[in-house]
Amino acid sequence: MANITAAMVKALREKTGAGMMDCKKALVEAEGNEEKAVEILRKKGLAKAAKKADRNAAEGRVEIYISDDYKKGSIAEVNCETDFVAKTDEFIEFVSETVKTINVNDIADTEALNKAPFGAGTFEEELKVKIAKIGENIVVRRIGTIKAPENGIVNGYIHAGGKVGVLVAAACDSEKTCEAIKDTLRDIAMHIAAMKPQYLNPEAVPADVIEKEKEIAKAQLLKEGKPEQVIDKIIPGKIKRFYSDVCVTEQEYVKAEKKETVAEALSKAAKAAGGEAKLVDFIRFEVGEGLVKNACNMADEVAAALS
């Protein structure tokens, strides 16, 4: 039987984050071989992680990664169970490395991400080890990437400590214009974070959504006693106001000194550099959007853990 020293246990614990007794048992089983002990702990970690996989993960962090040339941006929402874990350096670093992996490897979905090289193995393997180490369920809920068109640029913004993340892309007439609007594009990403647009522009709004808005507007006007011939003239104005609420290009730009839309603000920034630019895409993620958070209290959690 190999002599297992305190230093060996300490080194394995620092490497894996597992408990002291778990590390000692793994080293004994591996007859002192650290790499085998790591493998043993990882296998045990997978078993521990599987038990946590059905637990509610509605907290977390959104992170973005933009390539050095501003031609490609990626975004990911990674969920955990508590806000406490979401704010730890270890979780923040894990999310940052995750979105970087997505960007560098052109990963389109979570299935491909699971198979991607990450750390000492695949992403799926490292995720399960991380779950075992942190002690909470961790889920990569959604990912996305925007690639700039030719003579285009991508920029982004993270708001409220990773609670909201935005990527936004613009097409320009030249690389010079792209460089000139870089900061404006980041400001537009800030606008998107705050104003929560649903669509890029009026052309992106589905026809059935527009028809529904027209029906709602007509019903409201009829209730007000407006005659049919007047209603037909009022509805286009109501649809225009609808666009200004839900389309980023039509929204009133929050950083404008004078009243102007987001599209106008971008165009003005491009013209100042002698060029032209327009928005072509955006992604906005907000942590826990659409998820139901676990409302149980600490006493419930302890009781659940003991059951």
UniProtKB/Swiss-Prot annotation:
Compartment annotation: Cytoplasm
Domain of life of the native organism: Bacteria
CDD domains given in the database record: UBA_EF-Ts
GO MF assignments: translation elongation factor activity
PROSITE patterns: EF_TS_1 (PS01126), EF_TS_2 (PS01127)
Involved in Mg(2+) ion dislocation from EF-Tu, as annotated region: 82-85
Keyword vocabulary terms for this entry: Cytoplasm, Elongation factor, Protein biosynthesis
Keyword match Cytoplasm: yes
Example of a GO cellular component annotation carried by this entry: cytoplasm
Family stated for the protein in its record: Belongs to the EF-Ts family.
Role description: Associates with the EF-Tu.GDP complex and induces the exchange of GDP to GTP. It remains bound to the aminoacyl-tRNA.EF-Tu.GTP complex up to the GTP hydrolysis stage on the ribosome.
NCBIfam families: tsf
Protein name, entry field: Elongation factor Ts
Organism annotation: Nautilia profundicola (strain ATCC BAA-1463 / DSM 18972 / AmH)
